[in-house]
Amino acid sequence: PYIGLPVFLSRAFRHGAIYVRKASGITSPKDLEGRVVGVPEYAMTLAVWVRGILSDEYGIDTDKLKYRTGGLNEPGRTERITLNIPSHIELEDLGSSVSLNDAILDGRLDAIISPAPPQSFSDGDARVIRLIDPAGPIEREYFKRTKIFPPMHIVGIKKTTIQKYPSLPNDVYKLFLDARKIAMERVKEVAQSSANREMSPWYSEAYEYAVSIMGAEYWTYGLDNNSADLQAFCRYCYSQHLTSKLMSP
């Protein structure tokens, strides 16, 4: 068992993480109900956030999606935790020989929910399109309204290690706070430097735009700074049958 620290090493808005087979006729999020949707793992953080957003923002009953799990571009991925999903939810493994990308191209899937695009989309295959496109304006409006910048990954320390070194969680947390400060200063420095050190032509503009909407400290650690995010995630885990009771951060 691990103890989690409120240190969020990865965060991302996820409205743009839904890809659909163009011929499926899916043109809005509500159309996903009753359709066959691929996802690398039902319990992965990305999937939890997307289902939560679909429910909160679009009124979708995500239990009505027909889930197929598997590797995105390479077959064989399986759930890493044991699930206790109600029988009314259709959840099946694609198996060891078919990827989600294969399945959306051959018609077995109507859509894919994934943190990275399927290879067909990356290759410009017109048969696979992003459902919410462009996602950026909707994600920015979502943040302005909810103040949620979805956390993806956190830092964990083994309970046995903490038992040996009780001060370790606070010590590690302080180190990550220091590292975050350095990282944010570097991001600002690069954005405002006279020479572009990022291979992105509008990096400075993107940074300034993010700050104008989210504030200079847009990538925060700690429970108080992320209460809306964590409360939403706990609620999603419970409503999606991943926890037996409603947890609190």
Which sequence ranges carry the predicted segments?
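Residues within well-ordered alpha-helices
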Residues: 28, 50, 99-100, 233
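Secondary-structure end/capping motifs
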Residues: 156, 161-239
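Short, glycine-/small- and polar/acidic-enriched structural segments
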Residues: 1-63, 67-76
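A local structural motif
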Residues: 59-94, 243-249
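Pocket-lining segment of extracytoplasmic ligand-binding domains
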Residues: 78-188
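Residue-level marker of alpha-helix boundaries and capping positions
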Residues: 41, 90-91, 223-225
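Short, solvent-exposed beta-strand edge segments and adjacent coil->beta transition regions
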Residues: 34-35, 152-154, 216
